[in-house]
Regions:
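Interfacial helix-loop-helix junctions of multi-pass membrane proteins
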Residues: 106-130
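Membrane-interfacial, low-structure loops and terminal tails that flank and connect transmembrane helices
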Residues: 151-165
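"…centered on the first transmembrane helix and the immediately adjacent amphipathic helix/loop
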Residues: 2-74
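Small-polar-interrupted transmembrane alpha-helices in polytopic inner-membrane proteins
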Residues: 16-21, 94-114
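Membrane-interfacial alpha-helical segments at the cytosolic side of multi-pass membrane proteins
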Residues: 73-87, 132-147
Length: 165
């Protein structure tokens, strides 16, 4: 029962994440650009950048866009691997399935973006999205590994279980 609740929860998070990505891709070029400009403009205000502000905004907008791609796909990678880890498969298959699903979604997202006015598809974005997927998967596996090591260490420390000194 607990496994089913986890699966449903992670599946809902995958769907929400995918809908958000779809929404961003459906924005026309002007809307998308304005959102990036708003974010970098707020950053410039917080950092109190006056000198070379226009240059900062221009360069920063590109960085914000790439970080947005990476971040949203990192979260998708987290939800994908978390969902797939609820199934009893070898770890290498779980990682492969999560990676392939994430990359396929990134490719279809770029294809969808081609049909939004003022937007185009970019192989660079697919690469950044894929790196985000891999990073999300790696984060989850790292957290699980650390958790297991701490659990074993504490079990030994407090003599829980059948540990020998």
């Amino acid at each position: 029962m607990k496994t089913n609740i986890l699966r449903i929860t992670f599946l809902i998070l995958i769907i929400i994440n995918s809908v958000i990505i779809f929404g961003f891709s459906a924005q026309n070029g002007e809307e998308s650009g304005n959102l990036s400009k708003l974010v970098i403009s707020k950053i410039a205000d917080i950092l109190n950048i006056e000198e070379n502000r226009e240059n900062f905004l221009e360069v920063g907008e590109s960085i914000v866009r790439k970080l947005a791609h990476f971040s949203i796909y990192t979260s998708l990678g987290i939800w994908l691997i978390s969902f797939i880890l609820t199934f009893k498969l070898k770890l290498k298959y779980q990682i492969t399935i999560a990676s392939v699903l994430g990359i396929v979604y990134a490719i279809t997202d770029e294809f969808h973006q081609k049909f939004s006015f003022g937007r185009h598809a970019s192989i660079n974005d697919v690469i950044i999205d894929s790196l985000g997927i891999f990073f999300g998967i790696t984060l989850v596996l790292l957290v699980i590994t650390i958790y297991k090591k701490l659990k074993i260490k504490n079990a030994k420390k407090y003599k829980i279980g059948n540990w020998k000194k």
